[in-house]
Amino acid sequence: MSRIGKKPITIPAGIEVTVNGTLISVKKGNNVSTVETHGRVGIEVANGQVILTRNGDTKESSAFWGTYRALTANAINGLHEGFTKSLEINGVGYRATLKGDILELALGYSHPINYEIPKGLEITVEKNIVSVKGADKQQVGQAAAIIRGFRKPEPYKGKGVKYTDEKIIRKAGKTSKK
């Protein structure tokens, strides 16, 4: 069992955390992030920390305890620092351009792929690197996964869209018979 729920979450300066029943609201300026928790978890804000407690000793309450602690920490960290995922585009003629709030990708198909950037996310393009930034960790990861899914990297030449820290396992091509 992980016991990650035991760790208190330190609230950074400039972040305001309020609890209303089972709803945790994290606020910084005009940005608000909310986490809907389960009744099996108790929430307390004191001394600049958020402390989550289990309501009961069941296996489910332990699972919810760690999950909601992680979700709350992600909401606080997202508004404080933000999350970033970087993608690398490899291939001849493969490129990405920004046109307003649309990311246009040329990935070897007969047509360009237009991806509408969701609200709350910021996408930047530098040469062959596409960076997805935002306050919601789930939304940043989902957008990066969708962009990667347009042309996953293939194992023979490594062409496609991959995460910058992703390792592509390369395969050897066919060998000729003599």
Swiss-Prot record:
GO cellular component, as recorded: cytosolic large ribosomal subunit
Example of a GO biological process term: cytoplasmic translation
HAMAP family listed in its UniProt record: Ribosomal_uL6_B
GO molecular function: rRNA binding; structural constituent of ribosome
Matching Gene3D superfamilies: Ribosomal protein L6, alpha-beta domain (3.90.930.12)
One Pfam family per UniProt: Ribosomal_L6
Keyword annotations of the record: Ribonucleoprotein, Ribosomal protein, RNA-binding, rRNA-binding
Similarity field: Belongs to the universal ribosomal protein uL6 family.
Species name: Aliarcobacter butzleri (strain RM4018)
Protein role: This protein binds to the 23S rRNA, and is important in its secondary structure. It is located near the subunit interface in the base of the L7/L12 stalk, and near the tRNA binding site of the peptidyltransferase center.
Protein name from the UniProt record: Large ribosomal subunit protein uL6
Disulfide bridge map: none
